[in-house]
């Protein structure tokens, strides 16, 4: 919004909260869309457009959209890079990443019913520092993976339910 301020009279934003890839179509009807406009007339137009695209439309100010985007990076981008790291580990040991898909499906399904903090599982969420230590020992040869594992495990240990 601030990009247009003072340059044009009527302006606004339609912000779909979704990951987009050329390789996969998405059902836009289910995508949350966030809108903001410089004035009520423009807001009405953008809202009408957004409601034609999605069943989930709401107004959100620019400052809050920035926080929404940060949350999306954690929820989507960082989760995916963790899957990339998992694939790297599996491939090193002759396993296909597809073995993770049922686990990931169940993880996402739980998030439809539970708050993420309540859905957290694994050794750190149980406070099992012995298993965490054994995993870190196995990862000693890969500094990056070891650091990520350590930081995430520490966060989970400190923020357990």
What are these regions (language model features)?
Residues 10, 25-70, 75-112:
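Internal alpha-helical scaffold of NAD(P)-dependent oxidoreductase catalytic cores
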Residues 1-8, 89-91, 139, 156, ...:
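Alpha-helix C-terminal capping segments
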Residues 9, 18, 27, 79, ...:
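Functionally constrained cores in energy, signaling, and assembly domains
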Residues 98-161:
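NAD(P)-dependent Rossmann-like dehydrogenase/reductase catalytic/cofactor-binding core
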Residues 14-20, 33, 75, 79, ...:
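Long, contiguous hydrophobic alpha-helical segments, chiefly transmembrane helices and signal peptides
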Residues 15, 69, 135:
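Histidine-centered active-site/metal-ligand motif
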Residues 1-26:
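Rossmann-like NAD(P)(H) cofactor-binding subdomain of soluble oxidoreductases
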Residues 1-2, 42-43, 132:
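Short, well-ordered alpha-helical microsegments
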